[in-house]
Design a protein with these regions (language model features):
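Asp-box/WD-like beta-propeller blade repeats and closely related beta-sheet repeat scaffolds
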Residues: 82-156
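Short loop/turn segments that connect beta-strands within beta-propeller blades
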Residues: 47-49, 90-94, 163-167, 212-216, ...
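Short, solvent-exposed loop/turn segments at conserved positions within beta-propeller repeat blades
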Residues: 35-40, 78-83, 150-156, 199-206, ...
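Active-site-proximal cap/loop segments of hydrolase catalytic domains
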Residues: 444-639
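Cap/lid segment of the alpha/beta-hydrolase catalytic domain
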Residues: 366-486, 493, 527
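Conserved beta-propeller blade repeats
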Residues: 11-24, 57-75, 99-119, 147-149, ...
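Predominantly five- to eight-bladed beta-propeller fold
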Residues: 41, 123-160, 205-207, 254-257, ...
């Protein structure tokens, strides 16, 4: 068997954005292009079990169905990327035809109200007419930047209607609001939104609105006093999962509600205590998906349970589990009553599956390149966590494993913290297993998939979660004697980066560390992160009025105790965990005489490891692997 390599990234294909109409199942395919250092996006069709590629445009950005026979998608206009071209594609065959041009960049098609009226999403940036405007930013509202968007002063995204007959674009129908989820029902548009007050506001203040495109009227239906996760509809109700944050703050699992269009009131359908959607981490799921979908009048949804996804339905007011899946369900829909989904099994990348009459079958074979590769299967290890409960972790064994030899190992810590690790294919982990490492990972206290109580890490960062990770490490070393306890490294990103920082400032049991897009100082994080004020108050159970507590939970407080050689990976446009967090740790280790370095990626965001430029993702893996090789194997690499 051949090893997994870093450059395998360029052979992987990624899938998502699945939508259905009639018997047609359409989804997006993406693949990294090494020469252009970007990703190429095109549309795929599955009909009657046969898969074909619909487009060869390389940059399809959004699409929707006009009807069962016709698809629309958007592209930047070829000769003027400040405009968006709409293309109309017959699904029975034939060439796509450029049908409309909108004098705005990045326009997204959301849906058709009727054959002549389209619902669009457009972002507007106010024009700065001052000379050399590109040389500065004017910040007068908060948040002033957002990860993945850059500086957002004055930028607003609104819904518009485009009339194909008159070739006219309406005024924004969401003016004065910050729209979120939406649904088109019976010729009307229903959406959830917060008021646009030009400043931060509570997550738990969304209202429901109705827009009538015939009367051109917008009606405020009700203030939910909640944060909505989706918006679907049956015959006479709007259905949505929502949280009021009263359980465990921002990370509270949502409950299922219905808004009666007749009675104008909200009813609780299910006091759901689990999470909504797929929160299993991977670096091989580039495209987005959906957590809910209607099958006629039946609402279906996915949920993460410990380390995998299950599918449920709501028939009337009753919940039923309709599929227990061993891996992940990234995107799904129904075509003529048959479930189709893009998912991944343990140790595998994404494929297209269908479930008919209770039987699941795989339709696609997207990844023949992995058939001759060594894929380490995740072996379960149970340990007793900080909550005195039995918890599940996993170990990947190195390629060509010899039980009579000793091997280095890497503890990998997920982000979130309210996400999970599962057993699906994870490129970085499989790479290290192919390169001769044990890789071990778990879901410490604060992770998703085990209810609100287990996820409630508020005010406890670096305590029970740290204890879990140390107990898990102890258990792994006891049960896998082939791991050399003197050659164990640790890495993680985001929350995993915070934990890596916490670990190196509280123990020297790890001989190398790679801290990625991390948090090191909750006091400065409050003022520099795009989500700082609300996230700090929520996750630390206090704000700046209690600086002593924020400082106690900051790895910088104990930086003088750190001895572990540590690599820092950060991006200069990461506004979620800003680069100053890494700078503080870097300076602290340098002052202490600890071996360290930072690799800073320009024009990358918090998403570097998942959707960063392909060449940058390659360099990131090289840097971490070389750092571990140097300190755990004694292998020298060129700088």
């Amino acid at each position: 068997m051949n090893p997994i390599e870093i450059k395998d990234l360029y052979s992987f294909t990624f899938y998502g954005g699945l939508k259905t109409k009639g018997r047609n199942v359409v989804f997006v395919k993406a693949q990294a292009n090494e020469a252009n250092n970007n990703y190429e996006y095109d549309l795929m069709l599955c009909k009657d079990g046969k898969i074909s590629q619909l487009t060869d445009r390389k940059n399809v950005s959004s699409y929707t169905f006009e009807d069962k026979k016709t698809l629309w998608f958007t592209l930047p206009l070829k000769d003027d990327e400040k405009k968006t071209a709409f293309w109309r594609l017959p699904l029975k065959g034939g060439e796509a035809i450029q049908a409309e041009v909108i004098n705005q960049p990045g326009v997204q098609i959301l849906d058709f109200i009727n054959p002549d009226l389209m619902l669009l999403s457009i972002e507007h940036t106010p024009e700065d007419k001052h000379p050399h405007a590109e040389d500065y930013e004017v910040l007068a509202e908060s948040p002033y930047y957002m990860n993945g968007q850059g500086f957002i002063a004055g930028k607003r995204t609104h819904y518009y209607l485009y009339d194909r007959k008159t070739k006219t674009l309406s005024d924004p129908i969401t003016n004065g609001l910050k729209p979120d989820v939406f649904i088109v029902k019976d010729g009307k548009i229903y959406f959830a939104a917060n008021e646009d007050k030009g400043a931060r506001q509570s997550f738990f203040s969304m209202s429901l609105y109705e827009y009538d495109p015939i009367a051109k009227t917008r009606t405020h239906l009700i203030n939910t006093h909640m944060d909505l996760f989706n918006l679907d509809a049956d015959e006479n109700r709007l259905l949505f999962f929502a949280s009021d944050g009263r359980q465990i703050g921002l990370n509270s699992n949502p409950k299922l509600y219905a808004y009666s269009l007749a009675d104008k009131k909200i009813d609780l359908i299910a006091d759901w205590h689990e999470c909504l959607g797929n929160t299993v981490g991977t670096d091989c799921a580039l495209l987005g998906g959906n957590a809910t979908c209607m099958d006629k009048n039946r609402l279906c949804f996915t949920s993460t349970v410990v380390d995998h996804n299950n599918l449920f339905d709501v028939d009337g007011d009753a919940l039923h589990q309709i599929l227990e899946w061993p891996g992940t369900i990234h995107s799904f829909g129904f075509a003529k009553g048959v479930l189709y989904f893009i998912g991944a099994k343990p140790g595998e990348l994404q494929e297209l599956y269908k479930m008919e009459n209770g039987e699941v079958s795989q339709i696609s074979d997207f990844h023949p390149e992995l058939k001759d590769k060594y894929i380490a299967q995740a072996k379960p290890i149970f340990y007793t966590g900080s909550q005195d409960s039995s918890q599940l972790g996993w170990v990947l064994y190195p390629k060509d494993f010899d039980p009579d030899k000793k091997y280095p190992a890497i503890l990998d810590i997920h982000g979130g913290p309210k996400t999970v690790y599962g057993t699906i294919f994870y490129h970085e982990m499989q790479l290290w297993a192919s390169y001769g490492y044990f890789v071990f990972f778990c879901n410490p206290f604060g992770s998703d998939g085990q209810g609100n109580d287990y996820a409630d890490l508020r005010g406890k960062y670096g305590t029970d979660d740290y204890e879990d990770l140390m107990k898990f490490t102890d258990t792994v070393l006891a049960q896998v004697p082939q791991i050399d306890s003197e050659r164990v490294g640790v890495t993680g990103g985001s929350y995993g980066g915070f934990m890596t920082n916490w670990i190196i400032t509280h123990t020297d049991r790890f001989k190398a560390a790679a801290s990625q897009r991390s948090i090191s100082n909750w006091l400065s994080f409050w003022g520099t992160s795009d989500i700082g004020p609300e996230f700090v108050v929520d996750q630390q159970a206090c704000g700046l009025e209690n600086p002593e507590k924020l400082w106690w939970h900051s790895p910088m407080r104990t930086i003088s105790t750190a001895k572990t050689p540590t690599l820092f990976i950060h991006s200069d446009e990461d506004y979620r965990c800003p680069i100053e967090q890494g700078y503080q740790m870097l300076n602290g280790l340098i002052q202490n005489g600890v071996e360290t370095k930072m690799v800073l990626f320009h024009k990358e965001t918090h998403e570097l490891s998942r959707s960063g430029k392909p060449v940058h993702r390659e360099r990131r893996l090289e840097e971490i692997t070389n750092w571990m090789d140097t300190h755990l194997k004694g292998t020298k690499h060129e700088a």
